[in-house]
């Protein structure tokens, strides 16, 4: 392969590549908490999810309606996932971006959620975590719910 086309191809692929996973131990710890929340969700275990969140953790979902309006749903963990979790739900994320400063961190990533193996929707998750008593805990999770965005988001 001639050198110029190979370099152009490499440059194009690099522009779309996700950032490499962080090697920082604190970043890994932050990401592990978000993953533990997903693991608790998959186990349908409010107790396992509760172990990852701060008291009074808040959740917010954002969904664009068919008429173009935006629906915001806000709920406390204890009033939603903390009460009951349906079995068969699985959520996963990829290409996470972690920003951490002191005792505050965020994890932003595309995600997909399914129930009994069927995709419900994709979107962007934003976890906000705080370090309390030496451990990272989720203070809030915000997300978009975009049923038609999965093909686009899976490319990220």
Predicted feature descriptions by range:
Residues 4, 14-47, 51, 55, ...:
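Short, low-complexity N-terminal intrinsically disordered segments enriched in polar/charged residues
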Residues 44, 52-54, 93, 102-104, ...:
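Extracytoplasmic
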Residues 106, 122-149:
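Short beta-strand edge/turn micro-motifs at domain boundaries
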Residues 1-9, 129:
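Sec-dependent signal peptide recognition
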Residues 117-120, 147-155:
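A short, polar/proline- and glycine-enriched secondary-structure boundary/capping micro-motif
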Residues 53-55, 63, 109-111, 125, ...:
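A mature extracytoplasmic/lumenal domain signature
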Residues 34-45, 53-57, 61, 81, ...:
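Sec/Tat-exported extracytoplasmic proteins
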Residues 58, 71-120:
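Surface-exposed, charged secondary-structure patches
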């Amino acid at each position: 392969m001639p050198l110029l086309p190979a370099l152009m191809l490499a440059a194009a692929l690099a522009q779309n590549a996700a950032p490499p996973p962080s090697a920082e131990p604190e970043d890994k710890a932050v990401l592990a908490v978000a993953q533990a929340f997903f693991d608790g969700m998959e186990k349908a275990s409010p107790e396992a999810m509760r172990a990852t969140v701060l008291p009074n953790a808040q959740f917010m979902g954002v969904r664009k309606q068919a008429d173009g309006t935006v629906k915001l749903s806000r709920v406390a963990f204890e009033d939603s996932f903390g009460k009951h979790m349906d079995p068969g739900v699985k959520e996963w994320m990829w290409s996470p971006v972690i920003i951490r400063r002191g005792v505050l961190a965020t994890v932003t990533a595309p995600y997909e959620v399914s129930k009994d193996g069927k995709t419900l929707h994709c979107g962007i998750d934003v976890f906000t975590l705080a370090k309390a008593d030496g451990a990272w805990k989720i203070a809030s999770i915000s997300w978009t719910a975009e049923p038609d965005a999965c093909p686009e988001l899976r490319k990220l």
